[in-house]
Amino acid sequence: MLADYRLKWGASKLNVYEGPRRGFVGNFLSLTCNAQVQADYYSFSDQDDIWHAEKLEHAMEWLRTVPSDTPALYCTRTLLVNEENRPIGLSPLFQRRPAFENALAQNIAGGNTMVFNNAARQLLLRAGPLVDVAAHDWWVYLAVTACGGQVKYDSRPSLRYRQHNSNLIGANRGLLARLTRIRMLFKGHLKEWNARNIEALGQLRSLMTPPNVTLLSDFIRARDSALFGRIRKFRSTGIYRQTALGNFGMLLAVIFNKL
């Protein structure tokens, strides 16, 4: 199929590369860090996306206001549809500002909504395609905010995302999704993901802003402290999730040493 489209559109518009077969994170980062791919702006996509016609237009309207040497990330909500392309809901609406204090606790948007500039891509190149992170989109959010970049979260959905039983990553909404996250928290998944993200951020430490270097160090110390010290140190970091329920869940994670 891809070969047919390459013939139809021309080799200059569609290139096909062999992936590393290391799961979705390794595959996305392999392509993102491919030296043969050169552009001013980059966007992720997969087979379950149906882009809105104005997606790139809205992204570029904002990205062009950011200096080219400043890492910049545009992301949005998602319109969820079923296998027949019928709308079934929206991804969560987040209203608190995007920041490193938030990125340490969660990702705010799916990679399929993200468009980022070359300065942001240079951060991903610095860490490399083999960096061990929980998710490629969360990693972009972490890298850009850690290094003083700008993030625009647009409440307007930029695409339709098909939901079906074989989705690798769900929509992150509804009671079932919340229960799944709670179960994963108490199984230690969140703590493992944070450990991997912290290790990966070490690759960018020299590019991080001084306040964010301090914040990361405080976060690490809080995770390594005993119960009451952990609670006190964590509260002093200012790290937050986007919702009250999310912050309550994070407090439980701190108390039970699952962060």
Predicted features, each with a name:
Residues P129, V133, W139, R162-L259:
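C-terminal subregions of glycosyltransferases and related glycan-biosynthesis enzymes
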Residues M1-G174, I255-K258:
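Nucleotide-sugar donor-binding/catalytic module of glycosyltransferases
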